[in-house]
Amino acid sequence: MADMDFNDRTVLVTGAARGLGKQIARAFHALGARVALNDLKGDAIAAAIADLGAGPRLAAAEADISTAAGCENAVRATLERYDRLDVLVNNAAVNWEMPIAAHTEEIWDKHVDTILKGSFFCAKAAIPALKDSRGNIVNIASELGLHPIVSNVAYCAAKGGVVNLTRALAIELAPDIRVNCIAPGAMDTELMRDCAAASGDAAAYYRYYQNFNPLKRIARPEEVAETVVFVASAAAAFVTGAIIPVDGGSIAGRL
């Protein structure tokens, strides 16, 4: 399908060394895109690039996107390598599940800075290049940004912020730049495995999330990545400001 062709297009994915971000990079690369992978550590990016097949259409954009300067560095690295930017995917995230009483200022700031602040300042840094290409932004929120759960306040708050950030960016950046948001449900990624291990009962953790939605299973990251690619493609040219759950019906079951 021509509308899903990303040949001669450049995509920057934050938090791309593992998990959903890596699958998003894989999906765009398979459709012909040049993909810049951002993450904190260069060796982790290099390993991801090797796993994706290496080659001239894959590049590192190492930076700490929890700071405005880091966001600028990630965008700059992409433009220095490929001289254009067509799609920004704000995917980077952290998640430490704990009750309110256990939250420190450092933990709160790490969630908000990585998830919400990073999404805003990456978008801000990318605006000139995206205007030139009439490109678009895809923010990765979460079903928990739409219906929170207990013992996850900082993550839920930051992801909820991404939802409204998407809408605010969409109305201000139109008509030149589209901005949309994917709100995934629980996915079988390294981040989820880390959370399961930290819970003290990984089997119970997985059972909880498997029963969280009507489909009674956890998503595969490639299922979410395919939705990201669609929203970023010409097939979704009339879609902006949308919040799209990819959650197995979890939110519908809570309306």
Protein language model annotation of sequence segments:
Residues S142:
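Residue(s) in the substrate-gating loop at a strand-loop-helix junction
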Residues P99-I100, T104-V112, Y209:
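Substrate-binding pocket helix/loop in short-chain dehydrogenase/reductase
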Residues A2, H147, V229, T240-L255:
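Short C-terminal tail/terminal secondary-structure segment
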Residues A123, A158, T166:
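Active-site helix of classical SDR
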Residues A101, H147-V153, K216, A234:
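Active-site loop immediately N-terminal to the catalytic Tyr-X3-Lys motif
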Residues P128, I171-P175, A237:
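Alpha-helical segment proximal to the catalytic Tyr-Lys
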Residues E105, C181, A203-A235, V239, ...:
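C-terminal helical subdomain
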